[in-house]
Amino acid sequence: MTGLTYDSGALIAAERKDPRLWAVHKRALARGVLPIVPAGVVTEVYRSGRQARLAQLLAGCQIEPLAETSAKAAGVLLGRCSIDPGAVDASVAESALRRGDCVVTGNPEHIQALATGVNRKLDVIRI
């Protein structure tokens, strides 16, 4: 299994006990793959310490800070994209493209449009 990058849709699915998301997550951990969650994704989803399922998911993930070079690369993705998916989706796409990860997402159209804008392709798992 390649690496995984989670977007906001994946974290929301975890909160909602989506069995598809939890199956992907457990399979990744069993294979020694630690999913990546860009920090902006946490900002979009986290609201309080009472989100037990979100906390459980994040305990088995690596939160990736947004470095200046990554922020600029995500901005380039936005500038070349045919739609306006937003800065957080751009940071998810940049993060996954940099490592060759598969993106676990509720909105594959946004992620794929960002990659297409720079003539790249990202594999996605729709949740």
Language-model segments: which ranges?
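Acidic, metal-associated active-site segment
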Residues: G86-C102
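Short, hinge-like loop/turn segments at secondary-structure boundaries
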Residues: Q51-Q56, C81-S82, K121-D123
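Alpha-helix/helix-capping structural signal
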Residues: G9-A10, G40, T69, E109
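Short, well-structured N-terminal submotif of metal-dependent ribonuclease cores
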Residues: M1-V37, T43-A59
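Acidic catalytic patch
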Residues: C61-S82, A90, E94, P108
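Phosphate- and divalent-cation-binding pockets in alpha/beta enzyme and binding domains
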Residues: E44, A73, A113-L114
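Acidic, PIN/NYN-like endoribonuclease modules and their adjacent C-terminal/linker elements
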Residues: L97-I127
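Short beta-strand scaffold positions
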Residues: V37, P65, A87, T105-G106
